[in-house]
């Protein structure tokens, strides 16, 4: 199986791991790692143990970095998920219902700008009265 991805001017071919040990992934962090034998910089925000304010700040910080970066060798991956305790007020759904609209507003305010890859819980879910994050991501790429 062979594949390739072209996203925002960045081209990744199958078999792009850093080396035989794979992609180095930091736990609960925003970090940079190399892939494609060091030719691509993977910028990742995966602070999943944080609560709303800190998580939204981390997501917005990586969006701002992606927006101002024209280097096609930098790939941005932004996870909007938060680990939850399982209760109704501390659930994945509850976090997504607050984080997704907030980030959708930020993407809309940024206009036509590079966002990188956003990994979203409840993508496309219609939060009443709020902009849809999927539509805003697509519109930012037009």
Predicted regions mapped to residue ranges:
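Catalytic cores of phosphodiester-bond hydrolases, prominently lipid phosphodiesterases
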Residues: 1-142
